Each structure stands twice: as C-alpha cells, then as structure tokens.
C-alpha cells in the first residue's frame, strides 16, 4: 500500500504528524471490517443482542489499550463508553455517539440481513446505514487516534448506545438520569444529516440541527365479531380502513420554524426564478401566501418534512384467526411533529376528524417529551468546524443547519445542554436511502467519505488542525478483506 508522503517542511514548522500522516488505506479497511463484523451480530428489535456488539467493540479497545466503561440497563442491552484524554481539561469534551440496535428485518430481502454481503461496491446488511456504519466509522477513527503520539486539546468520547428514538429508555435517557457524570460532554456528533448531492445543481451539506418530535397514536375501530362465513356490515377492519382513508386525506397545516427559515433561505440562490419566488413567498409573504407556497414546496418529499407533520400507519392488528372476524381492529400511527407543535393540540385535531363516529377511538400511546429542546442555529464552534471541513471536502457546496425528518437521540443531548449536530454519508439520490428497507446497504465509497468527513471535523475541532491530505486513498481488496470475529 502506498502511503501519503510526509512533508519535511511541515515537520520543521512543528505541526503535529496528525495533520498530514493519516493512513487512509488502513482507516478505510478498518471501518469496512468493523461494519461487516457488526452487521454479523444480530442487534435487531424487539430483543437486540447489544451486549454481543459491545463485546466486539471493547475487544478492539483492549487491543488498543483504551479504557472503557459498560452500562447495562437490563439483560441483553448495553451502553459502551470510551475516552481519549485531552490536554486542556477546561475545554468541554466532544462525544461521538451511535446506537447499537437496528430495526427488525422485514420481508423482501434478497441478501441475508444478518450476514454482511459485499457486492458491486456495496455492503449489504441490517444496520448498514442505520446505524452500524456510524459505529464502524467512529470505532476505526477512535482506535487510530489513540495510537497517535499527539493528544487532542479536549477529551474525545465514543459512546455506543442502547436504543434510540422510542428505545432510548435503555440508552441516552437512562444514561442521562443514572450515569451522566461519566459523560458530561459539551458537544456531540451523531447520526441525522448528510450530503445531498447535486439535487439543486450543487452539493448541500446538511447538518442536522433539530429533529422532529416522535409520537405514536393508536386508532381502534369497534365492530361485531362473527364467524367469517356470516359477514356483517360493521366489520371492524372495514371501519378501520375508512378511518385510515380520512387520515390519508388529512393535510396538516404548514409551519415555518426558524430552522426551516434558515434552510430555505440558504438554498434559495440555487433555485430557478420560479423556485426563488416561491421561497420568497414562503419566507416573507402574507400568511395566505406562505401557506400556498408551502403547499407547492411540500410536493417535494424532503421539503414536506421541513414544513409539516408527517403521519405513517405502521402496525396493524385484527383477528388472529382466518375463520373469524374480530370485534376490534387497530393501527398504530407513527407521527413526526415539527418541534414547535403542541402535541396535545395536534392529537385533539386528529380526534376531531372522528368526533361523530362512536365506533372509532384514538389513544396517544407515546407522547413527545416537552418542552422540546431549542434547535442549533449554527453560531457555535462545532458548526464552524463542520463548515470548515465541508469547504475543504466539497469546495462548491453550501453547509446549512436543517431539521431531520426523523427523531433520535439528539433531542435528549440538546435537553442536557449539549451542542449536537447530526452528520452522515451521502443522502442522494434520496430514493436510495435504504434504512428500514429490504437489502439495506451503504456503498463503500460513501462509507469512506463519511469517515473522511467525520475525521476532518474531529481534527479541526478537537486538535485545532487540518487533516491533510483530505482526499482518501482507497484500500486494496486484500486490505479490506474482513476479519470475522467471534463473540
């Protein structure tokens, strides 16, 4: 493998070898190896074997003489924390965080979900993009940093957490209540953003500065349960389908949050004349013009998430027998609310859709925790490092704080006062976002690009140095051949 040249003149100026001697071939190979090995450990819901994934990670820590702590909220669940000490204890630590669990594997996979497959430049398997790629990237970078002679200015923490979104009661929520004194970070990088490629003629570096609020609502329809050979008109499934049709037709009003204002203002110069006019109405028009402009913008699926609440039916329940109808049928609606929404008012609005229907009931199964944390506004030093690194990697891109369509751990960190941004791999084309889909994958190029971006930010923020050269050196096939580790 060819190594990057070490520049003697830079050495003479006293710049740390960290600034230019990065061995991208080794780093890329390690990230790929870790991702493959982590995919091969089943950490899928509802009973994720996170302890086995944690065991794999702390074995890597042991090999590299890294101290670690493990926090186990209950059997099978685990949170693993490691630290690289900085030279200035007055600087608040930087936390690199990823979650160990994955969604369950649904139907339709052509590749084995629990065994990584490398094919056509892609790595297939459950968690490839949500979020074992983050764990693999952080682990490769963290172990490499520990073996360098120079220390960072501030502590760097790596937390492989248990659960996220509605599963955070074993992860960050639990840690914040029971073990936050072990973490006490001031800044954090997590999942949630990415690089949107050429959608509007240029690259957009999307730094997740806010999430949406997570809410589950259960709709239940009540009918008459009978033998299936003697059907009746008030079949609960038919009644539920009619209720779902109402939900499908419901169009939540648009809200223009401060984060959305920043995002649309940043992308306005990239639009054609019609697009610029629409965004101008959205940001500066009368309330009526704003709503009209929002409806036009919401035709784009991603823009819709920035302006409106979204509702997705997920779990259906009815009769368990093929020869009988149930007296009840229900569906769980997973709802992502804009951060300035009153959850109770939104729930009341949904209830009002069925106020004249006695056979339909709504229950808020999971309510968002309020008050919701204030979004990041991009005025802090961590965002400055994100922007500095993005300008080097993507010279013609714009870097903008924006809102993630999903929810996650970032809201819990922000509630603790931690300045938190979400960053990830390329997001384009958006149709190739395979998280929670059959044959989930990440391309090797995107994995290496994610590593390069995160490494550049860490160097800029924690070391106060450029990471040069920023261009990656691709590992050979032999270097990226995975070592499968048994747990």
Where are the predicted features?
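Acidic/His- and Gly-rich active-site-bordering loop/insert found
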Residues: 22-126, 135, 145-154, 333
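Short amphipathic alpha-helices in soluble, non-transmembrane regions
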Residues: 234, 346-354
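A short core secondary-structure module
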Residues: 173-175, 229-253
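Hydrophobic h-region of N-terminal signal peptides that target proteins for export
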Residues: 11-21
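Acidic/histidine-rich catalytic neighborhood of metal-dependent amide-processing enzymes
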Residues: 122-123, 129-206
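Sec-dependent signal peptide recognition
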Residues: 2-10
């Amino acid at each position: 493998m060819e190594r990057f040249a070490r520049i003697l003149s830079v050495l003479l100026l006293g710049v740390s070898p960290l600034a230019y001697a990065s061995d991208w071939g080794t780093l890329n190979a390690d990230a790929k190896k870790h991702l493959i090995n982590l995919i091969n450990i089943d950490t899928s819901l509802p009973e994720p074997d996170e302890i086995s994934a944690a065991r794999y990670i702390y074995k890597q820590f042991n090999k590299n003489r890294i101290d670690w702590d493990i926090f186990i909220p209950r059997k099978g669940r685990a949170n693993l924390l490691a630290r690289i000490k900085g030279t200035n204890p007055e600087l608040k630590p930087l936390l690199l965080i990823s979650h160990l669990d994955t969604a369950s594997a649904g139907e339709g996979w052509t590749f084995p979900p629990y065994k990584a497959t490398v094919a056509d430049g892609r790595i297939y398997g459950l968690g490839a993009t949500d979020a074992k790629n983050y764990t693999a990237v952080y682990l490769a970078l963290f172990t490499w940093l520990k073996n360098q002679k120079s220390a960072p200015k501030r502590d760097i923490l790596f937390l492989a957490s248990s659960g996220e979104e509605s599963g955070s009661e074993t992860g960050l929520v639990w840690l914040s209540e029971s073990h936050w004194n072990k973490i006490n970070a001031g800044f954090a990088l997590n999942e949630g953003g990415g690089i949107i490629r050429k959608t509007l003629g240029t690259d957009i570096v999307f730094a997740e500065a806010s999430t949406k609020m997570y809410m589950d609502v259960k709709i239940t329809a009540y009918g008459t349960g009978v033998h299936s050979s003697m059907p009746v008109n008030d079949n609960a499934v038919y009644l539920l389908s009619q209720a779902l049709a109402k939900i499908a037709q419901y169009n939540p009003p648009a809200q223009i949050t401060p984060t959305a204002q920043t995002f649309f203002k940043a992308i306005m110069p990239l639009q054609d004349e019609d697009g610029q006019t629409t965004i101008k109405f959205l940001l500066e028009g009368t309330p009526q013009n704003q709503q009209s402009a929002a409806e036009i913008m919401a035709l784009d699926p991603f823009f819709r998430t920035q302006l409106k609440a979204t509702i997705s039916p997920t779990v259906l329940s009815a009769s368990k027998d093929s020869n009988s109808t149930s007296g009840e049928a229900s569906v769980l609606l997973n709802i992502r609310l804009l951060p300035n929404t009153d959850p109770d008012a939104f729930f009341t609005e949904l209830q009002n859709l069925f106020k004249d229907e006695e056979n339909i009931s709504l229950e808020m199964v999971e309510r968002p925790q309020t008050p919701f944390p204030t979004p990041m506004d991009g005025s802090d030093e961590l965002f400055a490092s994100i922007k500095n690194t993005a300008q080097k990697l993507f010279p013609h891109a714009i870097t903008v704080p924006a809102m993630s369509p999903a929810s996650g751990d970032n809201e819990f960190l922000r509630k603790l006062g931690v300045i938190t941004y979400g960053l990830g791999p390329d997001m384009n084309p958006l149709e190739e976002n395979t998280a929670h889909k059959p044959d989930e994958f990440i391309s090797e190029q995107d994995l290496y690009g994610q590593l390069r971006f995160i490494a550049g930010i860490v160097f800029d923020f924690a070391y106060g140095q450029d990471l040069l050269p920023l261009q990656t050196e691709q590992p050979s096939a032999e270097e990226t051949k995975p070592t499968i580790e048994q747990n």
